[in-house]
Amino acid sequence: MRKGASRDEYVPQHGSRYGTRGTPSRGLADARIRVTKIAAIGMLTLAVIILGITAKTYASERMARSDASTVQTQNKKVTESKATASQTLSTASLKTRLSKADFNDIRSGDTVQTFSLVDDQIPALEDESLAALQDALDQAQELGDAGAVFYDLSSGKGVTYNADAEVYGASSYKALYVLYICESLVETGQVSLDDSLGTYGGYNMGWQTVRDLIEAAVVNSDNDSFIALRAAFDRVGYEDWIVGLGIDYDTALDPMSDFPTYCPRTSAKLWREMSEYLSRDTETSQWLSGLLASTTQSFIRDGIADDQALVRNKAGWISEAGCNATCDAGLIDVGGDTYIMSIMTSMPWSDHSSEVVAAIAKALYDTRAALA
């Protein structure tokens, strides 16, 4: 969102919020009343039809939707790795005994650095790995700011570069906001995935449910769905959730924008929370895990190009004056280990910037042996 302006000054667009909006509780209540009346008069079939034909306006940054076979393959990979990933994450928590506050100890600077959050045994990268990573980062720096964090959940060791570089995150934040909805609202029974949002801020979401909107926002990076979710749920605990995770709400997440500016360190903290949530093995957490594994765009997945790895991510990309970004972050499960990777750059999105972020992801991924 452009700085110096309020949310209400903008018409719907990437990075802005709809001009006016109703209260969340009122919107949900109205939606439930409509659904109840329809069910009472036997028009369930009509509701299903409406659901099926509801128009979807995809994000300006949307890529082509992956075909059904791709999604099916990713969901199968999630199912097959479910037990292993859950066990790995549980073991990692016991082994490292880290809190998200420990991520404050990650080094930050304009050179590639390694770190350990559990002991003083700082890992050393091989010269070839370091050179490949530095080269990819230098390419990104030619087009904008760049920062990255790559972290082994099991060992507590990682690699970092400009961990505090604040970058417009674009749609990379959509998955993290959905984490808030699922973890804080759905799991506690305050919100049902099957609730219809109805009308928010004068924008009619039709009969789309919370489930529909989350899937569209995460898998297809649909902006309208994400903005509708924020309009509905920002005021029912979002700020408390952020602060509770040790995130500086005022500086790390811009309260005036649906698409915040933040840094790789903050991203890593939030994806650590994501890893803990996905390991719970609840119906909602495993559903979200499948969505993250089925995203239509992943520079990380493209970069590491490892069929044995499960990548659960959310990328963000845009080329627009004042809010350029090519970013990606998520979890990588491979060989019984789980890694957090966050790459944030202010490069204007293009085929070239996509390739550069993919190259950074590949170079980071290739350092994992040194982090064991």
Stretches found by the model and what they are:
Residues G156, E166-L197, A217, M341:
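Active-site SXXK
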Residues E183-T209, D281-S285:
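Short, well-structured active-site flanking segments
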